[in-house]
Amino acid sequence: MPHTADRSTAAWQDLDRQHYLHPFTDYKALQAKGARVIVRAEGVYLYDSDGNRILDGMAGLWCVNVGYGRRELADAAYRQMLELPYYNSFFQTAHPP
């Protein structure tokens, strides 16, 4: 998988145009200007492929209200992934949270 810096904004927009259907989108406008390509995030800010810093007021659709780049959360998720990333609760099974 290429690193974001390995492609131009136009190249990422072209891939996006070919392979993704954006929800709640004016497709005529999207075709005219292309998608904003978000390449990284830190704290409450997003950064696009053109280097613009953008305040993420919607917290990634309210999924990252604690901010981006929180090392302690990434470490906790890593430890959990090593122990038990997922198991279903069908067939009378349970697991600790």
Question: How does the language model describe each region?
Answer:
Residues P2, D6-T9, R53-P97:
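Glycine-rich loop-to-alpha-helix module at the N-terminal edge of alpha/beta enzyme cores
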Residues D14-D16, Y45-S49, R70-A76:
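Short hydrophobic/aromatic-rich motifs at helix boundaries and adjacent loops
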Residues A35-D56:
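Active-site and channel-lining beta-strand-loop segments
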Residues P2-A41:
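Active-site-adjacent loop/helix segments that line or gate small-molecule/cofactor pockets in enzymes
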Residues Q18, H22-T25, Y45, V66, ...:
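Intrinsically disordered, low-complexity segments enriched in small/polar residues
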